[in-house]
UniProtKB/Swiss-Prot annotation:
Annotated segments matching region G2: 62-66
Organism (species): Corynebacterium jeikeium (strain K411)
Lineage: Bacteria, Bacillati, Actinomycetota, Actinomycetes, Mycobacteriales
Keywords in alphabetical order: Cytoplasm, Elongation factor, GTP-binding, Hydrolase, Magnesium, Metal-binding, Nucleotide-binding, Protein biosynthesis
Binding site for Mg(2+): T26
Region (G4): 138-141
Domain tr-type G intervals: 10-205
GO cellular component terms, A-Z: cytosol
Name of the featured protein: Elongation factor Tu
Protein location: Cytoplasm
UniProt xrefs under Pfam families: GTP_EFTU, GTP_EFTU_D2, GTP_EFTU_D3
Annotated stretches, region: G5: 175-177
Gene: tuf
InterPro entries in alphabetical order: EF-Tu_GTP-bd, EF-Tu_GTPase, EFTu-like_2, EFTU_2, G_TR_CS, P-loop_NTPase, Small_GTP-bd, T_Tr_GTP-bd_dom
Length: 396
């Protein structure tokens, strides 16, 4: 049989393994890479369990996280896969967004069923906006009783439904260890799992498809030409002579026109998501714009002062606070390119928050920031990061 030709133009999807410790997340990741490397050797390489388990440390928003990145291809897609071996690493990754997921494989051991961390991971996936979860029911080679497997599957579906995930999501029976050992029956189940990923995880919306948004990093004046702002385009596409709105930090927004777009001292007709661009804005003075504002497509974004966030508070060892904080705590919230002071309201029944905790809080900022659900922020005291969070709900 002729081999399928691999195309480099496949859709790219970010995926990850989640689930309780010792249920086989890392073994499942290793099995996927091995089985796909055996089936499509020209496009994949196999990653051993040890290589994934000894995850290198990464720093994201001042927080150290152990996380492994592997990649692989199916016939339909190219996947980047993250595996955070430790429970604390998983939580930190989800909240800081070191690796965002378009979908997740929830690994549940058939021998145990859903455990406390299984629940916690699914809840967190909901809070941080993972769009889709499907299930790998692992260690099925160790369970002979069909009825027991059905029972565990029902429990997992109930758990997904509780958090508003797809109750009808694929649940694929696997044995990651047997697949790694080369057992053909179980290798085929891993292929079935990947086919389920291809078919059930929706294609992610590309950043370029969203309305234009660029945070302002720097502002300077070019004599005789006007005011130039620089920054990295976060979303969308901007064309020369487009009208834009300048939002956030100040009471009023203002509109202007982009009369020149430059990148690396070259003139461009467009700037798109990911570009570091310099925009010349018509009729604006240097003092009309400041760092921390955003330049955006008019009418698409609104600044807010009150929101709820899911936050990870750094432990002392991670360079965080040495002491707990209480209600009405007033740190700085760093959004995109600037710090804004905010007042923290803790949930009812929570007296204080300890370094190393994961907490939901309500925040009132002293200046408005253009935000939507999912926007990430750091919590800082005197320029030092003490926490990381994500906007879960906008209140005002």
């Amino acid at each position: 049989m002729a081999k399928a030709k691999f195309e480099r133009s496949k859709p790219h999807v970010n995926i990850g393994t989640i689930g309780h410790v010792d249920h086989g997340k890392t073994t499942t990741t290793a099995a996927i890479t091995k089985v796909l490397a055996d089936k499509f050797p020209e496009a994949n390489k196999s990653f051993a369990f040890d290589a994934i388990d000894k995850a290198p440390e990464e720093k994201e928003r001042g927080i150290t996280i152990n996380i492994s990145h592997v990649e692989y291809e199916t016939e339909k897609r190219h996947y980047a896969h993250v595996d955070a071996p430790g429970h604390a690493d998983y939580i930190k990754n989800m909240i800081t967004g070191a690796a965002q997921m378009d979908g997740a494989i929830l690994v549940v051991a058939a021998t145990d069923g859903p455990m406390p961390q299984t629940r916690e991971h699914v809840l967190l996936a909901r809070q941080v906006g993972v769009p889709y979860i499907l299930v790998a029911l692992n260690k099925c080679d160790m369970v002979d009783d069909e009825e027991l497997l059905e029972l565990v599957e029902m429990e997992v579906r109930e758990l997904l439904a509780e958090q508003d995930f797809d109750e009808e999501a694929p649940v694929v029976h696997i044995s990651a260890l047997k697949a790694l050992e080369g057992d053909e029956k179980w290798a085929n189940q891993i292929l079935e799992l990947m086919q389920a990923c291809d078919e059930s995880i929706p294609d992610p919306e590309r950043e370029t498809d969203k309305p234009f948004l660029m945070p302002v990093e720097d502002i300077f004046t070019i004599t005789g030409r006007g005011t130039v702002v620089t920054g990295r385009v976060e979303r969308g596409i901007l064309n020369l002579n487009d009208e834009v709105e300048i939002l956030g930090i100040r009471e009023k927004s203002q509109k202007t026109t982009v009369t020149s777009i430059e990148m690396f001292n070259k003139l461009l007709d467009t700037a798109e998501a990911g570009d570091n661009a310099a925009l010349l804005l018509r009729g604006l003075k240097r003092e009309d714009v400041e760092r921390g504002q955003i330049i955006a497509k008019p009418g698409e974004y609104t600044p807010h002062t009150e929101f709820e966030g899911s936050v990870y508070v750094l432990s002392k060892d991670e360079g965080g606070r040495h002491t707990p904080f209480f209600d009405n705590y007033r740190p700085q919230f760093y959004f995109r390119t600037t710090d804004v002071t905010g007042v923290v309201k803790l949930p009812e029944g929570t007296e204080m928050v300890m370094p190393g905790d994961n907490v939901d809080m309500s925040v009132t900022l002293i200046q408005p920031v253009a935000m939507d659900e999912g926007l990430r922020f750091a919590i800082r005291e005197g320029g030092r990061t003490v926490g990381a969070g994500r906007v879960t709900k906008i209140n005002k």
